[in-house]
């Protein structure tokens, strides 16, 4: 008996709104069923890693905001840790608490967008509108500390650029008090919703072995039941002083990945609360004059301070020769920075490890045997942003 079935090839994207950026997906389909999914990337490639080689360590920081532009401060965090590792500089405790506080606010910023847009892709409009209201408040906190809502450029090797404005901690405290009820409202809309579960349960299943073999991290790995979190396994800054749980899934399907992200927001609220309670007084950046510019007051009094400031911002500071790899638990997974220095004021090589790159590679095996509508659901739970994938 001959098999006369003819497969069709379908181009999805790069303009399609459900591809979350500039993904071109070539689907080989047997009717409505997907046989293969071939992602074509590179449409947002800007040569970030090469550009960083021509910038001082200070000038390189804004490039990290533009990688995963949904969670900018976590990207800056990884670069700051890498430079600090080469410099062997001590970061003041207050600066460490501020960095952890804003990393967790960034996690909420990321997950609210992901869950809202995931619901919208599947056909639920309400969660996106409710969650964007909450994201707006976090973006205002960003604006208070850095002057910018998105590309914050706030973290620095050796600390943060400026102290928290007066009253900001109280505002953040009010936010985390009123935020959990809003999350409960979203959960009541989605968790047991029959249509939501039909679209997510048993779709895009990833076993523990597959998650490990493909190099998944973050909610993609924890959704498959592996409790791996760099904040616990390899803590940085003051995460070792924080009390929180690592939520995991059971089945590794789209529903588990959605639910892990939902639970992670509750854990982030706990960490933020602890940061506010334990926040010490003191300096917000290292006192090493090679890294920290003089204050405005000093520059008005001393010509040497003015020259020091000028040289620091034009030539930058020299970093000893060496290499290091530092990774943070970004909202999407393990975001790592490998820095290689030959001495001098510019990195010789800066390699960026983006979690979304590995996750997108798994789209092919996750989509096989599913309908085309399910591919949209799977892309949404991958939580991909092409700023970091294409770099």
Swiss-Prot record:
PROSITE patterns per record? COMPLEX1_49K
Pfam families membership: Complex1_49kDa
Intracellular or extracellular location(s): Cell inner membrane
- Classification via InterPro entries: NADH_Q_OxRdtase_suD, NADH_UbQ_OxRdtase_49kDa_CS, NDH1_su_D/H, NiFe-Hase_large
The EC class name is translocase
Identify the domain of life.
Bacteria
Q: Which pairs of positions does the record mark as disulfide bonds?
A: none
Any idea which UniProt keywords this protein has? Cell inner membrane, Cell membrane, Membrane, NAD, Quinone, Translocase, Transport, Ubiquinone
Q: What is its EC number?
A: 7.1.1.-
Instruction: Name the SUPFAM superfamilies on file.
Output: HydB/Nqo4-like
- Presence of keyword ATP-binding: no
For molecular function, the Gene Ontology terms on record are:
NAD binding; NADH:ubiquinone reductase (non-electrogenic) activity; quinone binding
Substrates-to-products reaction catalysed: a quinone + NADH + 5 H(+)(in) = a quinol + NAD(+) + 4 H(+)(out)
Membrane topology, as annotated, equals: Peripheral membrane protein
One GO term describing the cellular component: plasma membrane
Which family is it part of?
Belongs to the complex I 49 kDa subunit family.
Q: What does this protein do?
A: NDH-1 shuttles electrons from NADH, via FMN and iron-sulfur (Fe-S) centers, to quinones in the respiratory chain. The immediate electron acceptor for the enzyme in this species is believed to be ubiquinone. Couples the redox reaction to proton translocation (for every two electrons transferred, four hydrogen ions are translocated across the cytoplasmic membrane), and thus conserves the redox energy in a proton gradient.
Q: How does it assemble?
A: NDH-1 is composed of 14 different subunits. Subunits NuoB, C, D, E, F, and G constitute the peripheral sector of the complex.
Q: Name the chain's protein.
A: NADH-quinone oxidoreductase subunit D
Q: What organism is recorded for this protein?
A: Rickettsia rickettsii (strain Iowa)
Corresponding gene?
A: nuoD
């Amino acid at each position: 008996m001959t098999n006369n079935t003819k497969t069709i090839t379908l181009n999805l994207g790069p303009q399609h709104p459900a591809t979350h950026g500039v993904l071109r997906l070539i689907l080989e389909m047997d009717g409505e069923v997907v046989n293969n999914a071939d992602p074509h990337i590179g449409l947002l490639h800007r040569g970030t890693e090469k550009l960083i080689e021509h910038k001082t360590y200070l000038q390189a920081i804004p490039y990290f905001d533009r990688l995963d532009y949904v969670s900018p401060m976590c990207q800056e965090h990884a670069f700051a840790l890498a430079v600090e590792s080469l410099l062997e500089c001590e970061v003041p405790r207050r600066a460490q608490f501020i960095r952890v506080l804003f990393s967790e606010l960034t996690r909420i910023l990321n997950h609210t967008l992901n869950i809202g847009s995931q619901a919208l892709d599947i056909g639920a409009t309400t969660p996106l509108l409710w969650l964007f209201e909450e994201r707006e408040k976090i973006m205002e906190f960003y604006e208070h500390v850095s002057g910018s809502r998105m590309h914050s450029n706030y973290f620095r090797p050796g600390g943060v650029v400026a102290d928290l404005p007066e009253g900001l901690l109280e505002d953040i405290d009010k936010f985390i008090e009123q935020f959990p009820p809003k999350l409960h409202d979203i959960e009541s809309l989605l968790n047991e919703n029959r249509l939501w579960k039909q679209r997510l349960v048993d779709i895009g299943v990833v076993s523990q072995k597959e998650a490990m073999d493909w190099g998944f991290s973050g909610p993609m790995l924890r959704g498959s039941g592996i409790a791996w979190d760099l904040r616990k396994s390899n803590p940085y800054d003051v995460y070792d002083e924080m009390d929180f749980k690592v939520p995991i899934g059971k089945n590794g399907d789209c529903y588990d990945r959605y639910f892990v992200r939902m639970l992670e927001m509750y854990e982030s609220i706990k960490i933020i609360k602890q940061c506010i309670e334990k926040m010490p007084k003191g300096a917000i950046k290292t006192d090493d004059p090679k890294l920290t510019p003089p204050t405005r007051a000093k520059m008005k009094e001393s010509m040497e301070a003015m020259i020091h400031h000028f040289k620091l911002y034009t030539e930058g500071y020299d970093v000893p020769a060496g290499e290091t790899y530092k990774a943070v638990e970004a909202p999407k997974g393990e975001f790592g920075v490998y820095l290689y220095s030959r001495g001098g004021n510019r990195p010789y090589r800066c390699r960026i490890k983006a979690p979304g790159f590995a996750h997108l590679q798994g789209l092919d095996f996750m989509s096989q045997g599913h309908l085309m509508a399910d591919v949209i659901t799977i892309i949404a739970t991958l939580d991909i942003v092409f700023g970091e994938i294409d770099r």
